[in-house]
Amino acid sequence: MSAAICAGVLLASGTAARGDAGAVSWQAPTPAPGSVVGVAAGTKVTVQLAAASAVRTATIRIAPASKLPQGARLSVTPGNPARAELSWIPRGAQVGTHPLRFNAVDISAVPVSSQALSFQARVAPGTVKLSGLENVSRWAFVRRQMIVRAAPRASAYGKARLKAWTPEYYPNPVLALQERIDRNGTWVQVRLPILPNNSTGWVKRGALGDFRITRDHLVVDRAATRATLFRNGVAIFTTRVGVGTSYWPTPRGEFYITEKMSGFHNVAYGPIAFGTSARSAVLTDWPGGGYVGIHGTNAPRLIPGHVSHGCVRLRNASIVRLARLMGVGTPLTIH
């Protein structure tokens, strides 16, 4: 017999205790005495309890026999059978084992008849994937300057420093990969705009703004000199592009769009440009060098081809169309 559990796991089970004829007894789907209900921190668990008596006129009530864990709620429906539902979203600080004790009492009996029940909830550290499932990705703006850690704890090595603004003074976004909830708090693994490319690190959840969702994904094929934008896994835009030469290659890897800009004085960038988290160890067309941009051009005759210093060039009509479809935070794959 198993407990009715949402987003939890009954780690050890058996048969709920039953009393003598006429006495109160626990009924399915109540967890068995001594069983263990497993749940990850940050995930909701729901446990159903039921108790009954063979005496038809009995009125049973289920009540906690000890203090419930902080944040847990018990809703009770007296009767015969009586029912109760325990719901709880444990926090990271509650990782560990929590005893749960209840009494089922026949409040109509003289003397009062009752049956005790004890089992455990075991809270494990919770990790939730934020991007890459069912064509959904999540990103957020950086609220304040922070140190990015190599692991989800404050004592971990600092890998980089993230600022609230990009080098071009736009709000700085990060692509969120997964969220970790444990005794160290809530941490988010993010993709980093640093060398080496494809670097990731962990930041405190409070250092980021609200998560925003995108179902888009831009893929740049260097060999085919082609860029394709997918939405919900379906291609909605494709165009030929210019990419880096062998001396100044466009880097491969997993990146994201950091900013969308227009109004350049330099016509070489065309009418619109996107900043990305991709970096080049040598040079790019981007102001200041080092970052890989996606932008228009004043030399459309060179597209398609391996013609840039690392940036991805589109004909101006194509970059304008792409700008109508794609926003900041979009994942970018270059291969």
Range-by-range predicted roles:
Residues 24-30, 43, 47-83, 115-119:
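Surface-exposed or secretory-pathway low-complexity segments enriched in glycine-proline
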Residues 166-208:
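SH3/SH3-like beta-barrel superfamily modules
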Residues 126-178:
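Beta-loop motif signature
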Residues 126-135, 191-220:
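Boundary regions of SH3-family modules and the immediately adjacent low-complexity/disordered segments
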Residues 96-100, 186:
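Exposed beta-strand face motif in extracellular beta-rich ectodomains
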